[in-house]
Amino acid sequence: MSLEEVLDEIRREVTPDPEERELVEGFARRILSEVRDRLKERDPDAEVELIGSVARDTWLPGASDVDVFCVFPKDRDLDEIVEVTLEVGREAIEALGGEAREEYAHHPYIGGEVEHRGRTFEVDVVPCYDTEPGEVITPVDRTPHHNRYVEEHLEDTVEARLLKAFVKAIDAYGAEVRVKGFSGYLCELLAIHYGSFEEVLREAVRTWRPGFVIDLEGFVGEVYEDYDEVRETFEDQDPALIVLDPVDPERNVAAALSRRQLTRFILAARAFLGDPSPEFFRGRKPEPVSGEKVRDWFERNPTHVVAIEVRLPDEVEDIYWPQLEKTARSLSRVLENEGFEVRRWHVMRDSEEEHGYVLLEFEHGKLPELEWRVGPSGWVREDRVRGFVRAHGRFWVEEDGKLATRAERKFVRPEDLLGRLEGADRQTLLSHGFGKDLARSSEGEVRLLSAEELAELADRDPELGKALAEFMRGDPLSELVRDRL
């Protein structure tokens, strides 16, 4: 198929039909009305706005997320607007037969699930202030301005839908910490800036590199002296891309995007442009592996893998997931300091969000029992030389004048070191780089798992079966692009 034939086919797929449009927009009107009626009783000066892709008409078929913002005058106290929003949001969701729950991001808000004509909608009711563009009291105050900007500047909503479908299919959609991908707003801004989905892909392949700056409103030359100043401003983020928020030049819309996801997007874009196919919009989700396949893989695998089970804290994923990744990185450093070479690490969780898992892969599972240790030169400070000699006894002097010896290695297998974590207290876990909440919840609960135990987990929990499939088989994107690059 030609590029245009593929895009024509996908344009039809990503555009909601009239029946679905009436379903989604009809529900949005209902929840908006329920919230508005209750909010006006409590604060006549507050307003209600529908926010997000449904409001901006960039949602994909199957959409189930509806975001409602309660917008308050700036003179209201934050605790007051949160309390009012929690009340009206809970009442509105329950009035439609749904279940409400209190959530927390920058401040508390109400989330919930509501059944409507056979579809379950995820509803968020969020408080914010009525601010001017660029004025921020709370981080979510920008969001209504994002709505207005997209509505005013996005000429063809289907181009944003194409981009969203593309990044969703390659598992790069969403700014949450587990994904570190492209938010919906970022997709919309890219469609505005480049004019079309195809042009986004072509420019990504041609120009996107870590630190590349996208400036929709010409802030460079007005707010910033040059592009170097932009990069300096955001250097603490170590950004994959810098997309200056049109409503707030001090914010990088792409701050959540990781270099891994940037690379995956460029690979997918290059492969799609070279050999267009509808497959790029339909995704290749890994099927859960069976326990039998896990056993077989571990028997045949030439490398060495250690699996560690921890107990997750009772926190939202955005809190515990970065701590799980931090733990994997920290343990890798601890192991490397002892001479082990960690080739890669992988983290996953069970479907109940009770346990997390760190998989560490080594090229070799055993080190020599003796290790070479090089000490100071003989002419350096006396205490350093004395310390080395007294610690090791026998030594020789190398050609460059440094003292050297060989000593018995403290840890021969990675399990020798990691085994200290089993049943360990909080302080020991913290000293090995566990995140603070993870160290608290995992105190006395850390276990090293055998291949057999991993196989049993795969059979018991499809979420873990999928995560193990990705670890064992590699990135699903590789199957899509390998014959097209």
Swiss-Prot record:
Q: Does the keyword ATP-binding apply?
A: yes
Cofactor needs: Mg(2+)
UniProt-listed Gene3D superfamilies: Archaeal tRNA CCA-adding enzyme catalytic domain, Beta Polymerase, domain 2, CCA tRNA nucleotidyltransferase, domain 2, Poly(A) polymerase predicted RNA binding domain
Entry's EC annotation: 2.7.7.72
Under the heading InterPro entries, the entry gives: CAA_C, CCA-adding_arc, CCA_tRNA_nucleotrans_2, NT_2-5OAS_ClassI-CCAase, NT_sf, NuclTrfase_I-like_C, Polymerase_NTP_transf_dom, tRNA_NucTransf2
A Gene Ontology biological process annotation?
RNA repair
The main enzyme category here is transferase
Q: Which reaction does it catalyse?
A: a tRNA precursor + 2 CTP + ATP = a tRNA with a 3' CCA end + 3 diphosphate; a tRNA with a 3' CCA end + 2 CTP + ATP = a tRNA with a 3' CCACCA end + 3 diphosphate
GO molecular function list: ATP binding; CCA tRNA nucleotidyltransferase activity; magnesium ion binding; tRNA binding
Matching Pfam families: CAA_C (PF21133), NTP_transf_2 (PF01909), tRNA_NucTransf2 (PF09249)
Claim: Thylakoid is one of the keywords in the record: no
Its quaternary structure? Homodimer.
Could you say which protein family the record assigns here? Belongs to the tRNA nucleotidyltransferase/poly(A) polymerase family. Archaeal CCA-adding enzyme subfamily.
Q: What is this protein called?
A: CCA-adding enzyme
